[in-house]
């Protein structure tokens, strides 16, 4: 099931990015106008049996024009192996993106959530993005602008529907992306000053309800496999169904995301 969900994301990425470059080992998804956004400039390894050194070489080949390196490994077992190997190469790190499929959403109502277009919650989205970084990071405003733009492009590709809570003075948001019989809950965030009030649960439940109303057979969310939000998603009815390993090398200067 994880492969089908990944294919859903890849289809959106093909439509949202400016370029998709084919290589013998896989593909690179690029948006040269958004160089600070990692999610807009990354590569996918689709060939089995590559060594960590070969993966690094592929990253250098495909992302030579960028300060960062970000490369995902399509096959889960290959990704697990390469994540171990990459640890021996200075500057590189591995992360695990946990795919979680909705199994039992329960019967609880969404609560005080409001559906709005992105234009109606753009200021909140910008503040949520900025809150992910230290306020003194270099190029913070430019990075936030580029991430917001990439989110807009992805939303256009996936027919995004945004949900905020509370309905008055919103402090949390998420979106629902759609394609065929699949819905993805994405970009969940709550302002730091409003955390602990259950607002993330409220917007996620609203997105789940919208996904069910849209007739999606499968609704999923992606979380950091080593961070706490996955536990919240589990309480809302999502269950793990696979992992995507992403290998990264941060830039030596500046800031990216």
Locations of the language-model features?
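Conserved acetyl-CoA-binding loop-helix of GNAT-fold acetyltransferases
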Residues: 52-60, 187-192, 196-213, 231, ...
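A short helix-loop-beta-strand connector motif used in the catalytic cores of GNAT acetyltransferases and
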Residues: 13-21, 65-68, 95-96, 152-164, ...
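Acyl-donor-binding surface of acyltransferase catalytic domains
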Residues: 48-124, 133-134, 222, 245-249
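A conserved beta-turn-beta hairpin within the catalytic core of GNAT-like acetyltransferases
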Residues: 35-41, 178-186, 195
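A conserved beta-strand-loop-helix scaffold within acyl/acetyltransferase catalytic domains
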Residues: 149-191
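Short amphipathic alpha-helix that is part of the acyltransferase structural core
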Residues: 1-11, 42-50, 54, 97-99, ...
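N-terminal charged segments
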Residues: 1-66, 77-83, 156
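Conserved beta-hairpin
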Residues: 20-25, 81, 85-89, 93, ...
């Amino acid at each position: 099931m994880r492969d089908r969900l990944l294919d859903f994301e890849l289809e959106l990425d093909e439509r949202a990015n400016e370029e998709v470059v084919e290589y013998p080992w896989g593909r690179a998804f690029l948006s040269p106008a958004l160089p600070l956004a990692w999610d807009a400039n990354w590569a996918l390894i689709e060939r089995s049996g590559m060594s960590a050194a070969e993966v690094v070489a592929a990253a250098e080949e495909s992302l030579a024009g960028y300060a960062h390196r970000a490369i995902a490994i399509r096959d889960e077992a290959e990704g697990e192996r390469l994540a171990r190997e990459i640890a021996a190469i200075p500057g590189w790190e591995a992360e695990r993106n946990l795919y979680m499929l909705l199994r039992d959403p329960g019967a609880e109502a969404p609560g005080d959530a409001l559906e709005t277009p992105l234009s109606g919650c753009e200021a909140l989205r910008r503040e949520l993005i900025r809150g992910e970084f230290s306020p003194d990071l270099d190029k913070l405003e430019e990075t936030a602008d580029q991430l917001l733009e990439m989110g807009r492009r992805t939303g256009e590709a996936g027919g995004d529907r945004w949900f905020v809570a509370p309905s008055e003075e919103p402090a949390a948001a998420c979106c629902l992306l759609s394609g065929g019989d699949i819905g993805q809950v994405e970009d969940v965030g709550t302002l730091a000053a409003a955390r602990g009030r259950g607002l993330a649960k409220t917007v996620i439940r609203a997105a789940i309800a919208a996904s069910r109303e849209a007739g999606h057979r499968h609704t999923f969310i992606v979380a950091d496999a080593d961070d706490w939000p996955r536990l919240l998603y589990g309480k809302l009815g999502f269950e793990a169904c696979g992992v995507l390993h992403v290998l990264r090398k941060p830039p030596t200067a500046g800031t990216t995301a």
